């Protein structure tokens, strides 16, 4: 999760709480969403400092993206990972493609 505190963007890990178990697997509570946006990002993607356009979950389907928070911490978000961006004001974060590979992702706005 990317969030903003005292003017800086930081990472924070969050765990999903499983509230129901069925024969087909575990389920979390329902989270609010206002739609989905499909995105294809070229392998040359290198986007300098920017805030997120809205609070949203990003579900990485393939490829990877390196995210740098404004506090300097870097993380690589790989295939199958979900992250929540909430740094909608201020310097934001820096993001770039990993390994020159195209990436497909889904944005799930929550506002």
PLM regions and their residue ranges:
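A short hydrophobic beta-strand segment most commonly corresponding to one strand
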Residues: 84-88, 98-111
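A short glycine-rich, His/Asp/Glu-containing loop-to-beta-strand
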Residues: 5-49, 103, 111
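Short acidic-glycine-tyrosine-enriched beta hairpin
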Residues: 40, 70-88
């Amino acid at each position: 999760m990317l969030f903003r505190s005292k003017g800086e963007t930081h990472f924070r890990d969050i765990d999903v709480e499983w509230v129901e178990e069925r024969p087909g697997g575990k389920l979390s509570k329902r989270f609010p969403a206002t739609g989905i946006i499909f995105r294809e990002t070229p392998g040359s993607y290198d986007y300098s400092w920017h805030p997120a356009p809205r609070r949203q979950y990003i579900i990485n389907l393939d490829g990877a993206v390196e995210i740098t928070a404004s506090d300097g911490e870097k993380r690589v978000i790989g295939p199958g990972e979900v992250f929540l961006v909430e740094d909608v004001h201020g310097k934001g974060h820096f993001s770039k493609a990993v390994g020159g590979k195209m990436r497909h992702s889904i944005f799930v706005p929550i506002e």
